């Protein structure tokens, strides 16, 4: 079922124009700023947008201007992620999926994160995230669900990426919120 849903949602995403993505990203950013603005001097994980993903440059700027340490994922050991500090003056590097990564050696353990903002391909009605199918975030974030002080996990995507189905599996990352261009969904 996940393969079929992922394929359908990716087809919808690929039909978007750059203008569509830009306009819808701006609407999401306005909603997301309400949450990110409450984080000051914290450790925040974001992502660098790839094709047809919500653009979050304004959120990144807001988090940094509020004194937060911002981290982005980097692929290690072929199938896991580490989280490298993002510095505004560093040159980022494209990985094998054409996603920008930080060359920084300053890492943070997942236990040190306060806010996590994730891209999604889709989300089910219980808040389980559907990604591109590699399981990178699922493997790298699985420990946080055992933490006493779990970080807030926000998935951002377009409204059609929310599905009224249940496809979540025990290993899938569960979101606390999904922010779309039309609404905020609290799981």
Which residues make up each language-model segment?
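N-terminal active-site beta-alpha-beta segment that forms phosphate/nucleotide-binding
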Residues: 1-112
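Surface-exposed, charge/polar-rich loops and edge strands
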Residues: 4, 11, 111-116, 125-128, ...
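Short glycine-rich anion-binding loops that position phosphate/pyrophosphate groups of nucleotides
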Residues: 50-52, 121-125
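Short, well-ordered strand-loop elements centered on a beta-strand within folded domains, enriched
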Residues: 78-84, 128-130, 153
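A structured binding-face within diverse protein domains that lines the active/interaction site
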Residues: 102, 119-121
């Amino acid at each position: 079922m996940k393969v079929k849903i992922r394929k359908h949602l990716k087809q919808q995403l690929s039909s978007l124009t750059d203008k569509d993505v830009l306009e819808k990203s701006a609407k999401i950013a306005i909603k997301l700023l309400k949450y990110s603005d409450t984080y000051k001097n914290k450790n925040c994980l974001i992502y660098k947008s790839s094709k047809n993903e919500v653009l979050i440059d304004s959120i990144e700027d807001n988090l940094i201007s509020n004194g937060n340490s911002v981290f982005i994922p980097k692929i290690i050991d072929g199938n896991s992620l580490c989280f490298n500090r993002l510095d505004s003056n560093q040159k980022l590097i494209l990985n094998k999926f054409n996603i920008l990564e930080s060359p920084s050696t300053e890492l943070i353990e997942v236990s040190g994160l306060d806010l996590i903002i994730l891209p999604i391909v889709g989300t089910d009605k219980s808040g389980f995230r559907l990604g591109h199918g590699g399981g990178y975030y699922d493997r790298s974030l699985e420990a946080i669900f055992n933490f006493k002080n779990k970080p807030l996990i926000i998935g951002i995507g377009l409204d059609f990426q929310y599905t009224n189905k249940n496809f979540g599996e025990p290993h899938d990352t569960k979101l606390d919120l999904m922010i779309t261009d039309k609404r905020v969904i609290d799981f």
